[in-house]
Amino acid sequence: MRTAGSILILGAGAILAAAFGPAAMACEGTPGRDRLILEVENVRSNQGLMTASLYPGDPSQFLVKNGALRVWSVPAHAPETRMCIFLPGEGNYAVAIYQDENSNHRWDHKIFGHFEPFGFSDDPRILFSQPSYDSVKFTAHHGETAIRIRLEHR
């Protein structure tokens, strides 16, 4: 049997979750003082997973196999998906992200045809080749750093 007190507590919890949900999201990785909040815009569906790769300040590690410090996924949420990861410390980083619409854990793309939506930190203009590290790097500071990434749909 529910009492007025338990209903009040449940209602207050729902209000707090709605008000503070994004700030209270779970962060990926080893807990620490520094963290990155990704706000992924232009998410057109709730289909699949949003998968992000965090790259270190070394340009030679960018977009190479095993070059990422961490790869993690969360369920996609339209129109914006928020993600969080703990960082090893302040410094330069880069992020590559894609919406894994079929949840097969890889970015599906064809030379001529469908691409799963993708994006990079600092939203560089993408034409026919991958972006340079310098065009996507950002500086994370102690505490919380938030960046916005707009998904490209092709």
Tell me the role of every PLM-derived stretch:
Residues 100-109:
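Acidic, glycine-anchored loop motifs typical of Ca2+
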Residues 91-97:
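A short tyrosine-centered beta-strand micro-motif
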Residues 34-42, 52, 149:
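A short, amphipathic beta-strand motif
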Residues 73-79, 139-141:
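Short proline/glycine- and polar residue-rich coil/turn motifs
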Residues 81-88:
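Exposed aromatic-hydrophobic patches
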Residues 7-19:
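Bacterial N-terminal signal peptides
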